[in-house]
Amino acid sequence: MERGSRKTRVGRVVSDKMDKTVVVLVEDFVRHPLYGKAMKRTNKFKTHDELNECGIGDKVKIMETKPLSKDKRWRLVQIVQKAK
């Protein structure tokens, strides 16, 4: 998988209690296939944060990567906005 074709997501950090790992909540709006109602879908991704620079509430950009552990398949690309 080439680096340019990997999936990227933007979400916010909801947990930073692990070493070099943060949990990122990604919200997505999808339409119901039959009824057309817009629904909010959320996913939590365990993300590799090599420098431990993220804090709770930060808005971050993450990218798919090779499996780093049992649950970690994403890595931090950049911090879009620091929490206040």
UniProtKB/Swiss-Prot annotation:
CDD domains per the UniProt record, alphabetical: Ribosomal_uS17
Highest taxon listed in the record's lineage: Bacteria
Segment forming the signal sequence: none
A Pfam family per the record: Ribosomal_S17
Residue ranges of the TM segments: none
Matching Gene3D superfamilies: Nucleic acid-binding proteins
Keywords, sorted A to Z: Ribonucleoprotein, Ribosomal protein, RNA-binding, rRNA-binding
BP GO annotations: translation
Any one of the GO CC terms: cytosolic small ribosomal subunit
Entry annotated with the keyword rRNA-binding: yes
Database matches in InterPro entries: NA-bd_OB-fold (IPR012340), Ribosomal_uS17 (IPR000266), Ribosomal_uS17_bact/chlr (IPR019984), Ribosomal_uS17_CS (IPR019979)
GO molecular function: rRNA binding; structural constituent of ribosome
Similarity annotation: Belongs to the universal ribosomal protein uS17 family.
PANTHER family referenced in this protein's UniProt entry, alphabetically: 40S RIBOSOMAL PROTEIN S11 FAMILY MEMBER (PTHR10744), SMALL RIBOSOMAL SUBUNIT PROTEIN US17M (PTHR10744:SF1)
Record text on subunit structure and interactions: Part of the 30S ribosomal subunit.
Record function comment: One of the primary rRNA binding proteins, it binds specifically to the 5'-end of 16S ribosomal RNA.
Protein name, entry field: Small ribosomal subunit protein uS17
Native source species: Alkaliphilus metalliredigens (strain QYMF)
